[in-house]
Regions:
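Extracytoplasmic/secretory-pathway segments with low complexity and glycosylation-like composition
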Residues: 21-130
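Bacterial N-terminal signal peptides
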Residues: 8-16
Length: 130
């Protein structure tokens, strides 16, 4: 015999999982700060003033590639990457630099199919606690 109260936690879990799946990603309303295109490939950078989302598309399904990012005099990132099954690649970036109020970030993504790059400016945002 099934106890009615045993179903309550299971039902609650289903409702929470459904609500979480329906929620928009936290970055869905971030404005675009930079964009580049090469044929079917696109590179888009969106941000909220502190965090930035770097997204490339059209690289080719599961394609090998390179991701390059530089920010002032920091040692640049130069990574081997693999695109997702849909040909996309996404990373988040926090452009904080000690003793710097801002700067310019260069981002480049390439695969055998294309090469896209763009730059965007960042500025340190003061945190105001109310």
């Amino acid at each position: 015999m099934i106890r009615p109260f045993a179903l309550v936690p299971m039902l609650a879990l289903c409702l929470v999982a459904s609500a979480a799946a329906a929620a928009d990603p936290i970055d869905s309303a971030w404005p675009e700060v930079a964009r580049a295109q090469d044929g079917d490939c696109e590179l888009s950078v969106t941000g909220n003033g502190r965090f930035y989302r770097i997204a490339a598309s059209g690289l080719g399904a599961d394609a090998a590639g390179r991701f390059f990012l530089s920010n002032g005099d920091m040692k640049p990132l130069d990574w081997s990457i693999r695109a997702a099954g849909d040909g996309g690649f996404t990373r988040y970036y926090l452009p904080f630099r000690w003793h710097r109020d801002g700067g310019e970030v260069l981002v480049a993504v390439e695969s055998a199919r294309c090469s896209v790059s763009t730059t965007f400016a960042w500025k340190r945002v003061e945190v105001v606690v109310h």
